[in-house]
From Swiss-Prot:
HAMAP family in the cross-refs: UPF0344 (MF_01536)
Pfam families: DUF1516
Natural source organism: Geobacillus kaustophilus (strain HTA426)
Localisation per UniProt entry: Cell membrane
InterPro entries for this protein: UPF0344
A single GO cellular-component term on record: plasma membrane
High-level lineage: Bacteria, Bacillati, Bacillota, Bacilli, Bacillales
Membrane topology: Multi-pass membrane protein
Keywords noted in UniProt: Cell membrane, Membrane, Transmembrane, Transmembrane helix
Name of the molecule in the record: UPF0344 protein GK0697
Transmembrane region(s): 1-21, 39-59, 60-80, 97-117
Location, primary (coarse class): membrane
Amino acid sequence: MTHAHITSWLITIVLFFLAVSMERQGAGKAKIVQMVLRLFYILTIVTGLLLLHSIASISALYWLKALAGLWVIGAMEMVLAAEKKGKSAAARWTQWVIALAVTLFLGLLLPLGFDLF
């Protein structure tokens, strides 16, 4: 399940950058990419919940990582909304980067992640 989760969030990030790029160019198919992106949000959340459910003893850090993961998805939607409205998205991009960094740090720190820290 770990590989499915990692694959889903990697594809989600790629689709996010593609959606932002297409929105900036005013491409008509940007809406389709955003809908596929939202499908991958759901897939990422479901695989994350399945991973969380498979842990025997869930510490507070796992719940914090789950909340940080939801924060990443929320920040992605805020960036896309700002880009669509033509508003400045600098603060939203900063929020997304911070949320992603926190989530990746916790993911690598916890036992289900890789042994980097």
